[in-house]
Amino acid sequence: MDVRRRLPPKLRRPLPITESSHHHRKTPFPADVDRSPSPTPKASDALPLPLYLTNGIFFTLFFSVAYYLLHRWRDKIRSSTPLHIVTLSELAAIVSLIASFIYLLGFFGIDFVQSFVSRADVDVDIDVEPDILEADRRPCSKLMDQPPPPPVVMSSEEDEEIVKSVVSGKTPSYSLESKLGDCYRAASIRREAVQRTTGRSLLGLPLDGFDYESILGQCCEMPIGYVQIPVGIAGPLLLNGCEYVVPMATTEGCLVASTNRGCKAIYACGGATGILLKDGMTRAPVVRFSTAKRASDLKFFLEDPLNFDTLAVVFNKSSRFARLQSIQCSMAGKNLYIRFCCSTGDAMGMNMVSKGVQNVLEFLQSDFPDMDVIGISGNFCSDKKPAAVNWIEGRGKSVVCEAIITDDVVKKVLKTTVPALVELNMLKNLAGSAVAGALGGFNAHAANIVSAVFIATGQDPAQNIESSHCITMMEAINNGKDLHISVTMPSIEVGTVGGGTQLASQSACLNLLGVKGANKESHGSNSRLLATIVAGSVLAGELSLMSAIAAGQLVRSHMKYNRSSRDMSKIGS
């Protein structure tokens, strides 16, 4: 999908705040300086009465004299009086009609004139945002004693009125996009309303440079800006004979550098091998019957191989990519949990499988009219939660990735030894995780890499929970000289179409990996490749972190790369 950034309309914004402006100002509101913003001149200020009264008078006058003249015109037709003969009252009515029409015609140009007046006065309110920032610097106890920051005047009188309406609660904030028809303008107005309501500044949260049309109805509601996350690259990752530069969006120092070192070690040893074991997204509705006997009847019906083809036809109608693979049932009293599993092409597939499940439930109602559908999701799926069913059965893409690291590379690149890595993996990732009662967490930090790649490529960050299920294995081979390392990840949930993948930044990261959009030649191959790359990146991250721990370098490296000396000095002072 071709996403283009739309140039936003020019709104008045506060000027940049220099560092010196805060050094020389001790209090936000000095007594000897008037910080109140000067009123913005309006085209309507020239009117003798307030704008709303003037409008009311001319609207009333226009419709009143129009009605009067129409009434007189009908009377003249009935009495055969010539139309060109007019009385003094009729003449006054005609003049009033023309005057009110001219005013109403000009009224709609006031906002247009106002935009030029406002543009010439761009320096107004230069100290408004610094005052809000100064309030941010004060302790909460002092902040409570201070008046709220003065509002920023919007670029037009109409926008200013809308902001006031949102603040007062007359206009719902969520309805701005539909009412205005301009997503950027809606976000700008909502942003200013939030600042006035909370009395806190959003100066550090960017508004410009983002296509708000692209997220309408699919990615985010009620936007007021966007968060910037730095994106680094690790690699090249040599996986299945191909090189990949892996984008990682993170704020954790040392993470990208560590993963990059793992990629370097894997590359030096001939690369890694990734194998896709399974590909199927799941959804599990919960239905209830009056008795456990009736629930078991449906269970036996669904598990009968003779009925599977019929159910598959009904399910597959939801999409040309959806293909039902299996149905798994579990009972709890008279409640039945039905776990549907299907392939979903290059999409992550939650919406696709949900539509198919809805079709099957409607089909089953004819044979089981006493079935009560409690919910389309009964948590037997299981989505965005650590669950044994995902760890055992898998969800999304199940991938295993392995590599053989030679003794020479272990010593020179990873700065440790094969026996030290094998022992640490057993005591930390296996025994230590068992002591902790871990569920799918038999690894060092798989979630770190999964989250970073997910955010960069537009995946659902919440699905990092089950996608990070991973068991890391290390074994000495070739008479103890070399290291065999593998990661097994049964539930990587990714897609290359839909959701956040269509955003410009995330689409660029997918393009960097060569998996942007849907693969038209082989449906689903792009998402499967992305899952394999995620597993390969986790392999590199596990190898590097475990080596750092084995060599005693973890604390030293994090103090160097993951702790800002500038921040620490501020805390110390």
Swiss-Prot record:
PROSITE patterns: HMG_COA_REDUCTASE_1, HMG_COA_REDUCTASE_2, HMG_COA_REDUCTASE_3, HMG_COA_REDUCTASE_4. InterPro entries: HMG_CoA_Rdtase, HMG_CoA_Rdtase_cat_sf, HMG_CoA_Rdtase_CS, HMG_CoA_Rdtase_eu_arc, HMG_CoA_Rdtase_N, HMG_CoA_Rdtase_NAD(P)-bd_sf, HMG_CoA_Rdtase_sub-bd_dom_sf. It comes from the Eukaryota. Glycans are attached at residue 316. Its main location: endoplasmic reticulum. Pathway: Metabolic intermediate biosynthesis; (R)-mevalonate biosynthesis; (R)-mevalonate from acetyl-CoA: step 3/3. Mostly expressed in the petioles of seedlings and roots (both in main roots and lateral roots), and, to a lower extent, in seeds, seedlings, leaves, stems and flowers. GO terms for biological process: coenzyme A metabolic process; response to absence of light; response to jasmonic acid; saponin biosynthetic process; sterol biosynthetic process; triterpenoid biosynthetic process. It is an enzyme of class 1 (oxidoreductase). Its EC number is 1.1.1.34. Belongs to the HMG-CoA reductase family. This is 3-hydroxy-3-methylglutaryl coenzyme A reductase 1. The lineage of its organism: Eukaryota, Viridiplantae, Streptophyta, Embryophyta, Tracheophyta.
